[in-house]
Amino acid sequence: MKVIALRRDLVSSYADTQVYEHDVDKDYYENAYLISNITAHNVLYVDYSIQVIEILNKSGIASLIAINKDKLEILIKSNYTYDYYKNIVYLHDYSYYNLNELRTDQYWLTTTNIEEYILPGWKLTYVGQLGIKTRGHYTYSFICQNTATDDDIIYDYIYSNEVDFLPFLLQALNKRLTTAVNFHRLSNRIFREYLYSKVPKDTINIGPRNESMFTLLRYPYITNYAANEFKVSDLIRLTQEKWIGAENSQFDIGQFKNMCNVLSTIYYYYNKYHAYPRIYMLGSAPSYWLYDLLQVYNFDIETWDPLDTPFSKRHHKAMFAISDTEKLSDNSILYIDIRSDRNGADWREWRQRVEDETKINLEIMRKYLQRGKTRICCCKITAMDIELPATSILLHFPTTKIQSECYVICTQEMLQDKKRFVPKGAFYSFINNTKTDNVFVSPVYKVKPTNKFVVALYSLSNENNDRDKVIDFTQKQKRGIITLRMNNTFNYEYRLQFKSTYDYLYLPSEVSREGTIVTSYDGYIAMHNLSLSLESKATGNNHLFISFSDANYGQIDSYCTHMGISRRSHSVRFSEAATTLSGYMFRDITNGKFNLINTNVENAVSGHVYNALVYFRYNYRFDLLRWINLHAKDEVMIQGGRYYEHAPPELLYACQSALVFAKLQNDLTLIEYVNSVNRYILNKYNLKYADDPNYYIHIDFVDLPFKYTVPDPHLTGGLLFLNDFDIQNTITILRSVKEDLIALNLLTQYTYMLTDSIYVANVDGYLQFYYKLYMKFYRKQIVFGQSRMFLPHITLSKEKKKPVRIDATKLVIKSIKLRKIKSDVEYCI
């Protein structure tokens, strides 16, 4: 959802929009809570409060002020990620299609012939990283830029088996315009920029993908693990093949291949030396992608090529000779992409020339690596019978046409390793069947606890990582942020097919622990000053964000809060339910409380916990177990709102109701989740029951509207099991709440048979006070309350009577006493 604060005169009618007027009788948090549970996607917030807007943004709900119609229009019609600290709106909006325009953040693409193969009359526009160059398109009080591009379509094409680009593009556009936009993919690009800028220097980054190829250039101190190394020694496993030479792309993507090769070498250098290297490139022209590289960091780049390399710092318009290796300095990488043009030469002659050039390239690599220190080389080679260092790394990024070439990354240590003879056919097998798809070339990270800070976004759920080891990791890892795929199934599957592999599934209760926040994407990014206009949906591809040793763990009213916890419930309640009170009635009935009068006011069950359980697929931004843990330890820091501390019985009753709900729905996953939360509550609270009580709270009244035959009709305000040391504390507590108790609006409306022989009158208005009293006794370790549901009533007779109904009658308290059972001992309160 999104909240747009505005003047009353700007309010207009839009689809899926509701107006909320600030309620001056409620505080900021209560107003924010009410707004967050509105079911409309757009909320127009009139007579707004800045404090309410801040609360909503910190809860992950994008909330902005619109001061005119233009701002209102752009905020209503677009979805976005909002930096509420810097006041930047990152739009995720494809409306530029009505300009007959595709967009890219890759400058090199605009220098190719791609426009010959896109829709007639269309053009490709470069917008810079995160659409930075679109800022000039918007003139609002907030900074605004559009991050949407079509690079995902182009990349999918590059890695597909399709050659004709236009049909591929049309199909992709049709899909984009008829299905839900991949919103979190767009928003994640912004989030990663913010996250990586804040991680410590000892960070381990597990599973980065090409989406971060430019983002992570700023952080050489981060160690990346992508589990994608293919070594020369791995070629021996391949069946030998022949040259195919297949077309891969209609437009020229040679620069893409070169860009990825150089980036792969840079990141290999980062992992090894954690510093920025000087970059040498041989055969560099035209390398327009250097433009984007230099926007991120001012690399020292020196190049050699007879043709121009526009963005090189020092370009030598000449061929590089072997003797020139003496000019190359330490702390550098060398990219060798030398190959002369065929120019119609006979294929045998051409083949011999290519093999000779490969030998020269490898000699340049050898001489470069043998001199100095802290050097890494990426060298072009052709498929041929040759010896190479066994541990060197092979790359084969897509290019316009699959030829006989690939690339090898070699370090100074690899050069000293044993050599492995590789036949030509093994190279062809690698080239024909492999498209390297990740510039973060690195080994597998073995999932085990470490003292370092770990970032693992969307990379640990796959079947390569043992599920039990991952759960153990979540319980022992001290620092970091990881994601795991949430179990959204209904039959409690432990894994689910995802693309070509399986993902293991996890429930929040399996990974929760002290100090760890478990939340949704929008819940986590709010701690990085970001909020979203589009909440998480229960798509089946939802991820738990698990933040270890989070400094915000105790900030229960600031981050990952209960905001929006009833939104799904409201949606069902007002559109599908038998009555708008269905939820209240269901919760009471399933726990044996059959007095449904004022059930929405005097409910025996925690509605918060119930909603968090039954709609956990929608509400997992709210970290329920963290909430329970902080309450159990009495460490809740409340900043505002109508705070009510739930007693553990209310939490357990919520679990009971949720369990019945789950069984009615045949939701096996929810059954498991509810049972695990129930166990968690029992573990966190030291519950003792007065099932064999020796004292009770005796409340009698001035007058009763019903006839009675018992000598002393009264309300039992609670049963206790006290030792001699507890009595004075109990009296002190009761006297401290005496005025509150007397002020209660206690009512009675009917009589009923509590058992076959006990005739009672109901008492309304006491139950919520009972739970407040429960917590006061619990904090003092005084045993109060029984294991069964507490039903406030007055015993009238011990024989069967006919039930009576009357108008609600107020009960006036006459006296309050603490009495010992089967004794004359009593203490007046």
From Swiss-Prot:
Substrates-to-products reaction catalysed: a 5'-end diphospho-ribonucleoside in mRNA + GTP + H(+) = a 5'-end (5'-triphosphoguanosine)-ribonucleoside in mRNA + diphosphate; a 5'-end (5'-triphosphoguanosine)-ribonucleoside in mRNA + S-adenosyl-L-methionine = a 5'-end (N(7)-methyl 5'-triphosphoguanosine)-ribonucleoside in mRNA + S-adenosyl-L-homocysteine; 5'-triphosphoadenylyl-(2'->5')-adenylyl-(2'->5')-adenosine + 2 H2O = 2 AMP + ATP + 2 H(+)
Keyword rRNA processing assigned: no
Keyword vocabulary terms for this entry: GTP-binding, Host-virus interaction, Hydrolase, Inhibition of host innate immune response by virus, Methyltransferase, mRNA capping, mRNA processing, Multifunctional enzyme, Nucleotide-binding, Nucleotidyltransferase, RNA-binding, S-adenosyl-L-methionine, Transferase, Viral immunoevasion, Virion
Cell location: Virion
Residue ranges of the region described as N7-methyltransferase activity: 171-242, 426-551
Source species, domain of life: Viruses
Subunit structure: Interacts with VP1. Interacts with VP2.
Known function: Multifunctional enzyme involved in mRNA capping. Catalyzes the formation of the 5' cap structure on the viral plus-strand transcripts. Specifically binds to GTP and displays guanylyltransferase and methyltransferase activities. Has affinity for ssRNA but not for dsRNA. Capping activity is non-specific and caps RNAs that initiate with either a G or an A residue. Together with VP1 polymerase, forms a VP1-VP3 complex positioned near the channels situated at each of the five-fold vertices of the core. Counteracts the host innate immune response thanks to its phosphodiesterase that degrades the 5'-triphosphorylated, 2'-5' linked adenylate oligomers produced by the host cell IFN-inducible 2',5'-oligoadenylate synthetase (OAS). The host RNaseL is therefore not activated.
Protein name: Protein VP3
